[in-house]
């Protein structure tokens, strides 16, 4: 992990990797920064809105949150899809906020469509339009925190 450029842990995985108990957004940011990679994308992070979930992108200089509604009974594969979409955005040269918002919208939309069709796994082949042009509403905000000084 210290050699990685990007890490994409769930909140549970972040707690395990960092050896820290995480109860807040500030705890999440501190634990993510302690991991080492320049970008840590924490999925299933604490959200500000009720019945929502948050994807928190933590870098040495900034933190961006992307929140969307919870979808009960989410199929398997959401973390892998988030990591893949985030990597695709990096390779395309997009800025962090655009990558995060697009990745979160894609995963949220794919989950919602798959759940609607009672699928156990994400319906990637059937719902390809969500991969290319997601329409799901995701709110993004910059988190006011104390970034590390270079």
What kind of feature is each model-predicted range?
Residues 1-63, 94-97:
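Conserved phosphate/ATP/ADP-binding segment of small-molecule kinases
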Residues 63-77:
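Short pre-catalytic strand/loop immediately N-terminal to key active-site residues, enriched for Gly-Thr
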Residues 15-16, 74-96, 100:
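Short, small-residue alpha-helix embedded
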Residues 97-150:
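Charged C-terminal helix
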Residues 44-45, 77-79, 93, 118-125:
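Glycine-centered flexibility sites
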Residues 13, 44-48, 69-72, 103-108:
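Glycine-rich beta-alpha junction loops
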């Amino acid at each position: 992990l210290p050699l990685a450029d990007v890490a994409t842990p769930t909140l549970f995985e972040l707690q395990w990797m960092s050896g820290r108990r995480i109860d807040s957004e500030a705890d999440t940011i501190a634990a993510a920064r302690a991991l080492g990679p320049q970008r840590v994308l924490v999925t299933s992070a604490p959200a500000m809105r009720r019945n929502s979930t948050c994807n928190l992108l933590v870098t040495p200089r900034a933190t961006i949150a992307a929140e969307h509604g919870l979808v009960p009974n989410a199929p398997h594969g959401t973390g892998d899809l988030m990591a893949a979409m985030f990597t695709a955005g990096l390779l395309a040269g997009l800025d962090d906020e655009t990558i995060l918002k697009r990745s979160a919208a894609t995963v949220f939309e794919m989950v919602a469509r798959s759940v609607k069709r009672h699928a156990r796994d994400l319906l990637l082949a059937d719902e390809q339009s969500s991969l290319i042009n997601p329409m799901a509403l995701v709110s993004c905000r910059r988190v006011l925190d104390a970034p590390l000084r270079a």
